[in-house]
Regions:
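Short linear motifs in low-complexity or flexible loops
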Residues: 2-6, 11
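Glycine-rich, acidic/polar active-site loops that bind/position phosphate-bearing ligands
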Residues: 12-235
């Protein structure tokens, strides 16, 4: 529940005959695993043995490869079934929306079987030079400007909007877009935004659950690529 991606890595290592080590990956492991959730706040209402969390394969979102790691999108729920992530309530709401929309469609066409929600997100972000970032404790601690001049409002800097993209920023954009394409994220648009050092990227719209996964994933990619270009990215 950090508004960012989370991950748990498991190897394919298993025990073979006579104690030997083999690579194995079963369907049972793919469908559900039991990571520890005891470190999450519970208000003291749970015993430690009841503080388990379960990951379950989200088959509606495709797996992808990062480096040499196979990444499998999952939901994360508690021992008693409460959502410990934002994907679980999203999937539940999409299912409810599908059912309600199909009922409405049946008033006009009885052959409608399913309604798929799509989403076309756009990700705005600020790029801060690494040296300037480390000079600001508010940025380092909160990723927000908590002191200094008030932010620009009322479009005073509209000349920056849709203006020429600086070469250093363009190099960053090209690299993170290339990495995004390798992960199947269909990035289509990039441009300056209205505030100083503010920019935007946007993909082709997709099925809502997949679009949200891609949005979270591209922010993770942008953070990694920004460091290579001596930037820090703020969302």
């Amino acid at each position: 529940l950090t508004d960012a991606t989370a991950e748990k890595h498991d190897s394919f290592v298993g025990r073979g005959e006579m104690g030997s080590i083999i690579e194995i990956f079963s369907g049972e492991v793919l469908v559900q695993q039991e990571p520890d959730a005891s470190s999450f706040p519970s208000g003291g209402i749970r015993n430690t043995f009841e503080a388990r969390g379960y990951t379950a394969w989200d088959v509606s979102s495709p797996a992808f490869i990062v480096g040499n790691t196979l990444c499998i999108p999952t939901v994360f729920v508690s021992y008693t079934g409460e959502a410990l992530d934002y994907k679980t309530p999203l999937l539940r709401s999409l299912a409810v929306l599908d059912k309600a929309a199909v009922d409405v469609c049946h008033l006009f066409d009885k052959d409608v079987k399913k309604v798929i929600a799509t989403l076309g997100w756009e990700q705005e972000y600020f790029l801060i030079d690494e040296a300037l970032y480390y000079a600001r404790p508010d940025l380092m601690l909160a990723d927000r400007t908590l002191m200094g001049h008030p932010s620009s409002k009322d479009q005073q800097l509209s000349d920056h909007y849709f203006g020429s993209i600086p070469d250093r920023v363009k190099a960053f954009m090209k690299e993170f877009e290339f990495e995004a394409y390798k992960l199947g994220i269909p990035v289509k648009t990039r441009h300056n935004e209205v505030a100083p050092n503010q920019f935007e990227c946007a993909p082709v719209f997709e099925e809502a659950n997949l679009a949200v996964d891609h949005n979270q994933l591209i922010m993770d990619v942008m953070r990694r690529v920004a460091r290579k270009h001596k930037f820090r990215v703020l969302f």
